[in-house]
Each structure stands twice: as structure tokens, then as C-alpha cells.
């Protein structure tokens, strides 16, 4: 899908980095400012004087990500707009890509990252495996069996193997 194509370049990023990047993408002007600031080889002490969103400030610790976002500003802007308007759909698309990568053996534990899959339940419709619980309701002499769906699905998380290290995976989406 178009949404999967949009998130493919970042879907396999560690969760914490991905979260910062998604929020930062909603501030494309600040991405440009941060990229320019980083190009000057700044004194990091001057970072606190910047009036940027916290996500942008934290991403300056990962200059290659800021550079990538700046180099692909149309993509960054589209990602930010989509994340603001459809955050659940963005996260679902990321999970679909992670599932494909896990199933194909591409996404797995490495010395740099720990990949975990766990089943979760949610009371909102989405793709996944459905389990139902029945509730009977009488209406006009007929009994209607309502079955609210409780979705069971797998969520794949990616964490750094070393908590003090940010790993930016390199892959061709």
C-alpha cells in the first residue's frame, strides 16, 4: 500500500528512535534548522538555546537520521502529515512490515538489537485474529446475538541490545 511504502524506510528502526522520528516529522521546518545546525559542527551546549520540539532536540544525537529527513524533506513532510491525521494506520503499517521482515528472517535479534513479538488484545477493529464473546439482546420479540470483537494480534518491538547505544539499521526497503 501507499502507507506501507511511506513507512518502509523507517519500519525496522528501534522503537524509541522510530517514536522520536515520527514526532519530529511533524516539524519539517525544525528538521531543516537542525540539519543546518548540525552541518556547522556545533558546540552541543548551544542546543539548549534552540526553541525546537523535544523530539528534534533528541534526534540531533543521531545526525544521520536528521540528515536523511532533511535530504528527503517531501517524504518527511508527508510522513508527518500522515502521522498527525492517521497515527493508528501508520503504526499498523509499520507492524505489517515488521511482521513480513520477521517471517522472512530479515528482522531478528542481532548484537545491535533485540526483537520481541508479543500478543496483545485491543477492542478496536484492525487486521488480525479475532476472538468473539457473545451477548444476547432482545429486540421486538427476537433475540439478537451481539458479538463484540476483541482482536488478538502480535506486536513486534525492536529495542537496542545495549541501552546506551542508538542503532540505526541500514537496509533497502
Describe the predicted segments one by one:
Residues 1-173:
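N-terminal low-complexity segments enriched in Gly/Pro/Tyr/Ser
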